[in-house]
């Protein structure tokens, strides 16, 4: 198991919002995507080794642990390692609970996590396929009750 830090939700969210206000949401999202990608890769690599997991089991384990840590409830709706695709539903988002209906996709911090996890699993299988992730909806948006994240293969210039 990896060392953990535990902080109150309001403490983390308040710090997150302060950095977003200072940098701008777009810049902050880009920074968090890359940092989250790297962290997810590392976490999945270490946990797979520790627990003898591989493939989809690594991704499912990651979603379970994220859910247990209080970020929200992450549900893998679909995953296809051969295609490099995945769809994750987020219920009970810590961001949506703390911030309410803002009209924005507030959970962008999580986006790089899904591609990082998927790519580590693919690399462990010997695949050169790499992915990108995007948030398509948030419980913080009007008319939405859950967040949705989609992972798809990198193509063309994006590689």
What annotation goes with each model-predicted range?
Residues 1-109, 126-131, 137-159:
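N-terminal accessory segment detector
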Residues 108-125:
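Active-site helix/loop of acyl-thioester processing domains in fatty-acid/polyketide metabolism
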């Amino acid at each position: 198991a990896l060392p953990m830090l535990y902080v109150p939700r309001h403490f983390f969210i308040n710090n997150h919002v302060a950095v977003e206000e200072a940098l701008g949401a777009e810049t902050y999202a880009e920074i968090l995507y890359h940092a989250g990608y790297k962290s997810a890769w590392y976490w999945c690599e270490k946990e797979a080794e520790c627990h003898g997991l591989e493939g989809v089991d690594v991704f499912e384990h990651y979603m379970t642990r994220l859910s247990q840590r209080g970020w929200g409830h992450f549900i893998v709706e679909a995953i296809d390692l051969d295609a490099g695709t995945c769809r994750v539903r987020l219920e009970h988002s810590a961001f949506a609970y703390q911030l309410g209906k803002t009209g924005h996709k507030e959970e962008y911090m999580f986006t790089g996590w899904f591609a990082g996890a998927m790519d580590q699993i693919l690399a462990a299988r010997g695949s050169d396929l790499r992915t990108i992730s995007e948030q398509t909806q948030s419980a913080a948006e009007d008319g939405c009750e859950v967040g949705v994240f989609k992972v798809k293969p990198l193509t063309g210039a994006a590689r």
